[in-house]
Swiss-Prot record:
Binds to 23S rRNA. One of the proteins that surrounds the polypeptide exit tunnel on the outside of the ribosome. Keywords: Ribonucleoprotein, Ribosomal protein, RNA-binding, rRNA-binding. SUPFAM superfamilies: Ribosomal proteins S24e, L23 and L15e. Part of the 50S ribosomal subunit. Contacts protein L29. One of its GO terms (molecular function) is structural constituent of ribosome. This is Large ribosomal subunit protein uL23. One of its GO terms (cellular component) is ribosome. Belongs to the universal ribosomal protein uL23 family. It comes from Staphylothermus marinus (strain ATCC 43588 / DSM 3639 / JCM 9404 / F1). It holds the Pfam family Ribosomal_L23. GO terms for biological process: translation. InterPro entries: Nucleotide-bd_a/b_plait_sf, Ribosomal_uL23, Ribosomal_uL23-like, Ribosomal_uL23/eL15/eS24_sf, Ribosomal_uL23_CS. The lineage of its organism: Archaea, Thermoproteota, Thermoprotei, Desulfurococcales, Desulfurococcaceae.
Length: 91
C-alpha cells in the first residue's frame, strides 16, 4: 500500500445512518458518509472507489451545523448502493 492509499483510507470517517440517507440508498443509488473536513471531492471519490471497489459518478458535499463534512456519493448504475449499505450494516 502506498502512502497515498493509506491517506485515502483515513478520509471516510463513518457512514450516516439517518432516514434521509437510507431513502437516498434506494431512490438515488447514493451513499452518505461523514468524511475528513480537509478532503476534496476527488479525494472522497478516490477513497470510496478504493475502499468499496465501486465506480463513483458524482460527489456532493456540505458542512453540517456540527462542523462535520458530509458527502453524498452517487454510484454508477452497475453498482448497488444497497449492497454496500448492507455490508456496512446500515440495512
Amino acid at each position: 500500500m502506498s502512502m497515498d492509499e493509506g491517506r485515502l483510507y483515513k478520509i471516510i470517517i463513518r457512514p450516516v445512518h439517518s432516514e434521509k440517507a437510507l431513502n437516498l440508498i434506494d431512490k438515488e443509488n447514493t451513499l452518505t458518509f461523514i468524511v475528513d473536513r480537509n478532503a476534496s471531492k476527488k479525494d472522497i471519490k478516490d477513497a470510496v472507489e478504493l475502499v468499496f471497489g465501486v465506480k463513483v459518478l458524482k460527489v456532493r458535499t456540505l458542512i453540517t451545523s456540527r462542523g462535520e463534512k458530509k458527502a453524498y456519493v452517487k454510484l454508477a448504475p452497475e453498482h448497488r448502493a444497497s449492497e454496500i449499505a448492507s455490508q456496512l450494516g446500515l440495512i
